[in-house]
Amino acid sequence: KKEPKRFYPNGSLAANVLGFVGLDGTGLAGIEQVYNEKITGEPGKVFIEKDSRGRAYESTEVAGRPGQTVVLTIDQSIQYQAETALTMAIEQSGAKAGTAIVLDPHTGEILALANAPTFDPNDVGAASPAARNNWALQNIYEPGSTFKVVAFSAAIEKGLAKPSDTIDCQMGSITVAKRVIHDHHPFGTLTIADALAKSSNVAAIKLGLRVGDPTMYEYITRFGFGSRTGVELPGETAGVIRPVSRWQPSSIGSVAIGQEVGVTPLQMAAAFGALANDGVRVAPHLIREIRSAGGGSSYRPNPEQRRVISKQTASALRGMLEGVTLNGTAKKAQLDGYTAAGKTGTAQKIDPKTRTYSKTKFVASFVGFAPVNDPAVVIIVVIDEPGGAYHGGDVAAPVFRQIAEQILPEMGVIPDTDFKNPELVARAVQTPAEISKMRDEEKRRDEDVREQESRDSTMPRVAARDNKGGEIVYAVATSNAILMPDLRGRSVRDVARACAQLGMQLEARGEGGRALGQTPGAGAELRQGEIIYVDFGKLN
C-alpha cells in the first residue's frame, strides 16, 4: 500500500521557514506546524453497518475536506541568494552560526529568511538541533551599535538634536554613574551625522542622557523591541527589554549603545523597516494568502502599521545612515549601481563562566536598506562568533552587499548611481518587457510543477507566488513521493548525487559550472529510472 508522504523539491531551501512533518504527516516545525490543520484537511470516512453475522448491509460515506494551499511571501531566487551568501560567509569566517533576512519595508513581506547552519526537511533525522533552530527569531543577542539609531531617532524627533549640530565626543571617553565607557577611537567634536557614521559611543550616550530614561524606553518599544513581531512561525521570542523601573543609574549608558538589551534579527530588520518606510513600521509576515481547494482566497493578511517617528525624522536618519556606508564604518556595504544606507554592529558576548563581556567572542552585524531615497529592501546580516575579523563592517557588511547586488537588478529596481561592474550594468538595464520575458521562461521551465493535488491526498502545497502570479512549490504531497527537485544553481556533483538518490539517470549538457535548466521541471512526477536532462554553465 502506498502512503502519502511529504516531499520538499528544493531540499534545504527555506527549511527553517517551511519546517517539516512527522511520520504521520503532522507538522512539527515552521509553517508546517503553525498551519498543520489548514494544510492537512480532513480525510474521508466510511461508516459500515453490519448484521449479527458481521455481514455489511449498509454504508454511509462522508467526504473528506481537502487541505488548503498556504502561499508564502518568500521569493525563491532571493532566498537562494541570501542562503548562498550567508553560508559562504559562515564558512569563510569560521563562525558558529548566522542569519540573513530580506524584508520589503513598505508591505512587511519577508522575501527571504536564511539561517546557517540549516537542514534538509527530507532528511530531518540527519540534522542537528542547532541546524533546526530558527536563529532569526528564536535567539536573542545584544545588538551593539545597530541599536544606536533609537537614541539618535528619539533625540531628533524630540527636537533635542539636528544632524548638522555638533557634539563633543570628549576624545573618546565618558563617565555614567561612575562607569567609564570608551569609543573605539578618540573623537573630538563631530556633527551628529558624523557621530553616527563613525559610531561614537560617547555621542550616542550623550543623546540618550538628553532624551532621558522614560523617553528612551518609549522609543525602544515604539520600534518594536521587547515584543514579538507576530510572524507566523513557532517559537518566536520577545527579546529582553527591562522596564525603566529596573534600570540602574548607569543603564542609559549601556542601553544607548545596544548593551543591556536583547533583540532578535527579525526585530532589528523591522525597526530599520520603519526608517526606510518614512517612519511607519509594518509588521513582518510570511503569509501572502491561504487558498481553498477550489482556488479561492480564504485569507489575506492585514499587517499592523504603526508610526514610530515622523516622516522628517526618518528622512534625516536615512541620510545619516547613508553616511555610514560612504564615510563611516560600513564602506564595505557600498553597492555598485545603488545607494545604500545602514549601520554596523560589533557586540561582545557574555562569557557564561565569568558573567562579564568576552574579549574573544563577538556578534557581528549589519542592517541596511537600498536604494536610500526609495528603499526596495531592508537586509540584515548577523554572524555569531566569527573567527579572525569580527567587526560588523568587515564580516556582515560584505554579505549585505553580495545579496543586494544580486537581487536589486532582478527585482527590477532602477539604479540610482553609477555602475563599475559591466555585468551588473547588463542586468540592471533590462526593460520591464525583458524582465517579464525572463520570468516567463522560468515559468515555462517549471510548467510541469503540479498545480493540484491528487484526490487521494489531503496534503496540499506550501508555495510562494512570483511577481507574475505564477507559483513556486516548496512542499508537496504525492502518492508515491517521487518528485523532481529543483536542481538549478547546484554543482555537477550535487546534481549527480541527487539523481542517484532518486534512482534516475543523469544526462548532463554543457561544460560544468552550475545547473541552469532541467527537464523535467521541479515538482514533476518521475518514473523509476527516468532520464534527467540538466544544462550546466556559468551563473550570471
Task: Describe the residue ranges of each PLM region.
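Conserved, well-ordered alpha-helix/loop/beta-strand core segments that scaffold catalytic motifs
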Residues: 1, 55-98
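Small/polar-residue-rich segments within soluble enzyme cores
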Residues: 1-67, 381, 398
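Acidic/histidine-enriched alpha-helical segments
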Residues: 5, 95-107, 168-171, 233-237, ...
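Solvent-exposed, polar/charged alpha-helical surfaces in well-ordered, non-transmembrane soluble domains
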Residues: 11, 15-19, 29, 33, ...
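Flexible, solvent-exposed loop/hinge segments and secondary-structure transition points
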Residues: 14, 25, 78, 85-107, ...
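Beta-lactam-recognizing serine transpeptidase/beta-lactamase-like catalytic domain environment
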Residues: 50-61, 74, 105-145, 150-383
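Ligand-recognition elements built from short beta-strands and adjacent flexible loops
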Residues: 337, 402-540
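C-terminal, active-site-flanking charged/polar segments
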Residues: 373, 378, 386-387, 393-417
